[in-house]
Swiss-Prot record:
Topology term for the membrane: Multi-pass membrane protein
UniProt record similarity statement: Belongs to the DP1 family.
Classification via Pfam families: TB2_DP1_HVA22
Database matches in InterPro entries: TB2_DP1_HVA22 (IPR004345)
PANTHER family registered for this protein in UniProt: HVA22-LIKE PROTEINS, RECEPTOR EXPRESSION-ENHANCING PROTEIN
Domain of life: Eukaryota
Keyword annotations: Endoplasmic reticulum, Golgi apparatus, Membrane, Transmembrane, Transmembrane helix
Entry text on domains: The short lumenal loops between transmembrane domains 1 and 2 and between transmembrane domains 3 and 4 may impart a wedge-like configuration, thus deforming membranes.
Job of this protein: Required to generate and maintain the structure of the tubular endoplasmic reticulum network and the vacuole. Induces high curvature in membranes and causes membrane tubule formation. Involved in membrane/vesicle trafficking.
Segments on the Lumenal face: 73-74, 123-126
GO CC terms: endoplasmic reticulum membrane; Golgi membrane
Gene source species: Cryptococcus neoformans var. neoformans serotype D (strain JEC21 / ATCC MYA-565)
Protein name, UniProt field: Protein YOP1
Length: 206
C-alpha cells in the first residue's frame, strides 16, 4: 500500500503539467519575496522568526481571508480595518519623511477613501451588511487594490474620479463667489485652483 502511494506521488510530481504549475508558483513566490524585500520591517521579522517573508505573508493572508470570508469569531471588521490601516500607515510615514512628493496624492486619496468607508460603517453597518453580506470581503479587496504599490489604485481613483469632481466644485465656487477665498490665506488652499506656499511644502522641497 505504501509503495503504491509512493508511486502515485512520483507520477504526480513527474507530470509535466504539475511541474509547470510548481514552476509558476515558485516564480510568483520569488516575485513576492523580492517585492517584500523592499520593506526593512519585514526583513527584520524574517531574521527574528526564521520564517521566509513570502511564506509568512501568504499564510497570514490565507488566514485573514478565511476569517473575513466566514466572519469567524466576529473578526471580519477588525481584521479588514487592520489590513486597511497597517501597511498604508507605514508607507504614509515613509512618504512624509521622504523629500519627494510623488506619493502624496496616493496616500492622501487613500485615507480619504478609507475614512469614507469607515464613516459609512459607523452610520449604518447593519443596513450595509443586510444589502451586501460580503461587504468586508469587497472592502478588503478594494483597500488592497487602493494601497498596493503595484496597482496604486488610490492614485488612479484620484485622477479619474476625485480630481474631476473637485474641479466641478471649483468651477461652481468661482462662478458663485469669485476666486478670492479668505480661507486660502489661513490654510494655503484656494478653491480657484492655486495653492499658496506652506511650510510643509517648503520642507519637502529642501
Amino acid at each position: 500500500m505504501a509503495a503504491h502511494s509512493e508511486q502515485i506521488k512520483n507520477n504526480f510530481l513527474n507530470n509535466p503539467y504539475a511541474q509547470q504549475v510548481f514552476n509558476i508558483a515558485n516564480g510568483q513566490v520569488s516575485a513576492l519575496d523580492a517585492e517584500l524585500n523592499k520593506y526593512p520591517i519585514l526583513r527584520q521579522l524574517e531574521q527574528q522568526t526564521k520564517v521566509p517573508k513570502a511564506y509568512g505573508v501568504i499564510a497570514l493572508g490565507f488566514s485573514s481571508v478565511l476569517l473575513i470570508f466566514f466572519n469567524m469569531f466576529g473578526l471580519a471588521q477588525p481584521i479588514s480595518n487592520l489590513i486597511g490601516w497597517a501597511l498604508p500607515a507605514y508607507l504614509s510615514i515613509l512618504a512624509i519623511e521622504s523629500p519627494q512628493t510623488n506619493d502624496d496624492k496616493q496616500w492622501l486619496t487613500y485615507w480619504v477613501v478609507f475614512g469614507s468607508l469607515n464613516l459609512v460603517e459607523s452610520m449604518g453597518l447593519r443596513a450595509v451588511l443586510y444589502w451586501v453580506p460580503m461587504y468586508f470581503v469587497f472592502k478588503t479587496l478594494f483597500t488592497i487594490w487602493l494601497m498596493l504599490p503595484a496597482t496604486r489604485g488610490a492614485e488612479i481613483l484620484y485622477f479619474h474620479f476625485l480630481r474631476p469632481m473637485v474641479g466641478n466644485v471649483k468651477s461652481r465656487s468661482q462662478s458663485s463667489f469669485g476666486t478670492s477665498d479668505p480661507l486660502a490665506k489661513e490654510t494655503g488652499f484656494n478653491p480657484a485652483g492655486t495653492t499658496a506656499p506652506s511650510s510643509f511644502a517648503h520642507e519637502k522641497t529642501l
